[in-house]
């Protein structure tokens, strides 16, 4: 296999962008494991008392990820996130203002392999979220297990990540002052198995939990489409029904996370590696769908609102797909 090496002479700014994405990839794929190893080493070293003190802190702080987390505007505004967003680049586009007196549930589509667009747009200020949506506080939902990892939990909470359990959503959407925006990758980990360049298959037809949540709390729904999200990595062919796909689906049910076999590019070559390819991501935030508070919604009400959400998502796709390199005759695939 021929390896396509990067040229030696490229602008220094591009080097900085690559370094920014490299640190993100390492932290996303290996930081949790390193933090666990560090804690164990600390526990069995002469500094064991520090591990013990942190263990006490962890016990006392256990519920924080389900109570709004502990965001840090300083961390969200690090210059590294500006270079991170410029690498692809990632662009956040607002199609309608969102009144901060309401709470919102933003349905993010598609999940992609590593949810790059959601992280860049809602966990950092690299694309100017606070400027585009003044008064709103974004919270990207993440699997609860990651918030049990020592040290790592502090880092991810600083970027506005919160636990995806029900109590976490209930806490944020119950804030009467408004201005809370929950960002949910609706397709979840299973959708990562369909993340392939040029394809856009969304697992949405049977996803109604976020709809019920919106009705229960009267949170307005906002469809969000991230064009280009699936183009960042190549994935081993895994059609539904194949041995590989069946194995991946079984492991996902057991582990709670998807295990797509993917590759991108390297630091000094473009042929293979764990860095995402430099391909643009355009994250389009649609118009809000007003939702009246219904503490005990019926199945009919849930189905009706779900159908409206799907229709608005299709409309968003149809309106914008031609602007971002998608053939106008290509339809959105929902399953």
From Swiss-Prot:
Keywords: Acyltransferase, Cytoplasm, Endoplasmic reticulum, Glycerol metabolism, Glycoprotein, Lipid biosynthesis, Lipid metabolism, Membrane, Transferase, Transmembrane, Transmembrane helix. One of its GO terms (molecular function) is 2-acylglycerol O-acyltransferase activity. It catalyses: a 2-acylglycerol + an acyl-CoA = a 1,2-diacylglycerol + CoA; a 2-acylglycerol + an acyl-CoA = a 1,2-diacyl-sn-glycerol + CoA; a 2-acylglycerol + an acyl-CoA = a 2,3-diacyl-sn-glycerol + CoA; a 1-acylglycerol + an acyl-CoA = a 1,2-diacylglycerol + CoA. It comes from the Eukaryota. The chain crosses the membrane at residues 24-44, 104-124. Pathway: Glycerolipid metabolism; triacylglycerol biosynthesis. Belongs to the diacylglycerol acyltransferase family. It is found in: Endoplasmic reticulum membrane; Cytoplasm, Perinuclear region. GO terms for biological process: glycerol metabolic process; monoacylglycerol biosynthetic process; triglyceride biosynthetic process. It is an enzyme of class 2 (transferase). Glycans are attached at residue 206. It is a multi-pass membrane protein. Pfam families: DAGAT. This is 2-acylglycerol O-acyltransferase 2-B. Its main location: endoplasmic reticulum. InterPro entries: DAGAT. Catalyzes the formation of diacylglycerol from 2-monoacylglycerol and fatty acyl-CoA. Involved in glycerolipid synthesis and lipid metabolism. Catalyzes the formation of diacylglycerol, the precursor of triacylglycerol, by transferring the acyl chain of a fatty acyl-CoA to a monoacylglycerol. Plays a central role in absorption of dietary fat in the small intestine by catalyzing the resynthesis of triacylglycerol in enterocytes. Has a preference toward monoacylglycerols containing unsaturated fatty acids in an order of C18:3 > C18:2 > C18:1 > C18:0 at sn-2. The lineage of its organism: Eukaryota, Metazoa, Chordata, Craniata, Vertebrata. Disulfide bonds: none annotated. One of its GO terms (cellular component) is perinuclear endoplasmic reticulum membrane. Its EC number is 2.3.1.20, 2.3.1.22.
């Amino acid at each position: 296999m021929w390896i396509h090496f990067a040229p030696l002479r490229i602008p220094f700014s591009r080097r900085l962008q690559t370094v920014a994405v490299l640190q993100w990839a390492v932290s996303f794929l290996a930081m949790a494991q390193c933090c666990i190893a560090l804690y164990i080493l600390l526990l069995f070293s002469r500094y064991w008392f520090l591990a013990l003190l942190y263990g006490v802190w962890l016990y006392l702080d256990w519920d924080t990820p389900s109570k709004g987390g502990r965001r840090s505007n300083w961390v969200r505004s690090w210059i590294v996130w500006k270079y991170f967003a410029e690498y692809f680049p990632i662009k956040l586009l607002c199609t309608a203002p969102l009144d901060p007196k309401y709470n919102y549930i933003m349905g993010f589509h598609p999940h992609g392999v590593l949810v790059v667009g959601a992280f860049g747009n809602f966990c950092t200020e690299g694309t100017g979220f606070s400027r585009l949506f003044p008064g709103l506080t974004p919270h990207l939902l993440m699997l609860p297990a990651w918030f049990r990892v020592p040290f790592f939990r502090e880092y991810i909470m600083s970027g506005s990540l919160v636990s995806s359990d029900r109590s976490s959503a209930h806490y944020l959407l119950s804030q009467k002052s408004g201005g809370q925006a929950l960002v949910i990758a609706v397709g979840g980990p299973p959708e990562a198995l369909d993340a392939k360049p040029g394809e856009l298959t969304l697992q949405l037809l049977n996803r109604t939990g976020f709809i019920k949540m919106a009705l229960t709390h009267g949170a307005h729904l906002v469809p969000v489409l991230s064009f280009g999200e699936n183009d960042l990595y190549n994935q081993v062919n895994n059609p539904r029904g194949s041995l590989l796909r069946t194995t991946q689906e079984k492991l996902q049910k057991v582990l709670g996370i998807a295990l797509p076999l993917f590759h991108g590019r390297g630091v000094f070559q473009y042929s293979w590696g764990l860095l995402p390819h430099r391909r643009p991501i355009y994250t389009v935030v649609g118009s809000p769908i007003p939702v009246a508070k219904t503490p005990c919604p019926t199945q009919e009400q849930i189905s009706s609102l779900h159908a409206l959400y799907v229709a608005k998502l299709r409309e968003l796709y149809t309106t914008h797909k031609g602007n971002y390199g998608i053939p106008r005759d290509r339809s959105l695939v929902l399953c």
